[in-house]
Amino acid sequence: VNDLHDIRDRFPGVTGEWARFDGPAGTQVVDAAIDAGAAWQRSGNNANSHGSFAAAVACDALVETVSTTMGELLGAGPGGMVFGPSTTSNMMALTRAIGRGLGPGDEIVCTTLDHDSNVSPWLLLARDTGATVRMAELDPTTGRLPVDAVTDLIGPATRWVAVTGSSNAVGTIPDTAAVTAAAHAVGARVVVDGVHLTPHHVVDVAAIGCDVFTTSSYKWYGPHAGVMWVEPDLLDSMDVYKVRPAPDSGPGRLQYGTPSWEALAGIDAAARFLLETGMDRIVAHEALRFARLLDGLHGIDGVRVVGPQDTVDRAPTLMFEVDGLPPVAVAERLATDRVAVWDGHNYAVEAMLPLGLDAEAGAVRAGISVYTTDDDVDRLLDALRDVAASG
C-alpha cells in the first residue's frame, strides 16, 4: 500500500504527543538505525580500521558495507563515499582542497536557493584565493531556480558550480542534470547539495552527472552524520589537506580522523530502511500529506504561503507567514499545542530577501516526513486557525 499507515511504529521518538513538522532540520530516528548503532557499540568491534585482528577487520567491512548501501541509495556506486560529522564540515574540507587549485580570474557559480553550507564555503574559498563567486538568482514569485539563471553565468572562466538538489526552505527542485551538462560543456565541475532531496525523492547521481553529491543521514531517519560522494578519479586527483599517515587515494583522503563506527552502522540501517520501504512509496505517501497541508493553508484567512503555491517539482516542505505576527511568535504559539515547526531563515540565508522575507526573521517552516499522518496535518491546521484568528 502507498499509505504506509504502520510506518510510524518504526519510530520510537514519534509518540503522538507532538505533531512533528520539524523534519527538514532533522528527523526522528528509525528503529533499525537506533538498534544498529547500539549493537555496534555492544559488539566489541569498536576499534579502528586496517588492523589484523577481528574487530579491526569488522571496521573495514562496515565501511565497505555502508559505502555499498549508500551507492545503491544515491545511484552512484560504492566508490568515493566520504563520511564526516556533517555536510557543512564535509563541504569545508572539500572547498579547502579545491582552493589550492584556484586563483584570480577563476569563477564559481552559487545560487540564492541554496542552504548556506553550499554557499559560505565557496565565499570563504573566493576570499582566500581571489576567485570570484557569481550568484544565480531564484525566481522571487515561484521560489524556483530557472536553469538559465544558472547557465547564463557559466562561461570559460567557470571552474565550479554549486547548486541545491532541493530547497530546504520551500522545497523546489532545480534541474541539476541540465545545470551539470552546461557546466561540463565548459570543463567545470558540479557540486549538488542533496541534503533536502534525499529523503523525499529518488536520487540518481549517475543521471544527474554531477561530480560531488552531499547528503546528511539525520535528515533521513539516521544518526547525525554527513555523507559526501566524490567522483573517484576527482577524489584521487585533488590536492587535499590531510595528515601524513592518511591514505593517498580513496575517501580516507578527505575523512579527518577515525569515523564514528556506530554512526556508520546507523547510516547503513537508515539507508536500507529507505531502500526496503521504497522511495516511490515514500514519495507517494508524503505527497498526499503535503497536498492536504498546502490546501489547508490556502483556506486560512491571514496565512500566506511563501513562494510556490502548488506541489509540482518540490519536496514536501513549505514556508508561511501569519498576518500581524512575527514567525517566532507563530512557532511559539503552535508549540503550546504540541505542534513542532521551525521559524527563521533556516540557513537558506540568500533566499530570504528574494522571497520577500526579513533576512533574520524569515518565515515559519513546516515539512512532511514519512511518519507524518493526516491527523498531524489537521492538528497543525486547526492550531494555526486559532493563531491566525487571534493574531
Predicted regions located by residue number:
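Pyridoxal 5′-phosphate
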Residues: V1-G391
